[in-house]
């Protein structure tokens, strides 16, 4: 539907690309000393407006990987970061728009 929101499969490759971009940008803009990685995409929608715009609801979790100034990690590296023990894990539910 032009201009309207359409549900998308959370496993769709384009949704996964948008999610990877969202995680990298979230970490780049976050003042937290550690990286957050994707636990899962909860919901995904898209809108066709001069390209594809994605609306994502994602669960993120804080990792043990500390950020190093001038050496940002890429999505695949972030996803390989270890997690703290279950009781010490910090999870966030975040909404992202990727265009």
Swiss-Prot record:
A motif (Secondary area of contact) lies at residues 47-51. Keywords: Disulfide bond, Protease inhibitor, Secreted, Thiol protease inhibitor. GO terms for molecular function: cysteine-type endopeptidase inhibitor activity. Signal peptide: none annotated. Pfam families: Cystatin. Disulfide bonds join 65-81. One of its GO terms (cellular component) is extracellular exosome. Residues 3-99 form the Cystatin domain. Expressed by the venom gland. The record marks 3 as: Reactive site. It is found in: Secreted. It comes from the Eukaryota. The keyword Secreted applies. Inhibits various C1 cysteine proteases including cathepsin L (Ki is 0.1 nM), papain (Ki is 0.19 nM), cathepsin S (Ki is 1.2 nM), and cathepsin B (Ki is 2.5 nM). This protein has no toxic activity and its function in the venom is unknown. It may play a role as housekeeping or regulatory protein. Negative results: does not inhibit calpain. Belongs to the cystatin family. PANTHER family: CYSTATIN-M. This is Cystatin. It comes from Naja atra (Chinese cobra). The lineage of its organism: Eukaryota, Metazoa, Chordata, Craniata, Vertebrata.
């Amino acid at each position: 539907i032009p201009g309207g929101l359409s549900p998308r499969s959370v496993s769709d490759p384009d949704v996964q690309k948008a999610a990877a971009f969202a995680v990298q940008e979230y970490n780049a803009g976050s003042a937290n000393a550690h990286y957050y990685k994707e636990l899962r995409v909860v919901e995904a929608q898209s809108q066709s407006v001069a390209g594809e715009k994605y609306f994502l609801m994602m669960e993120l979790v804080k990792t043990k990987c500390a950020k190093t100034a001038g050496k940002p990690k890429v999505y695949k590296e972030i996803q390989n970061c270890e997690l703290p023990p279950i009781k010490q894990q910090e999870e966030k539910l975040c909404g992202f728009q990727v265009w």
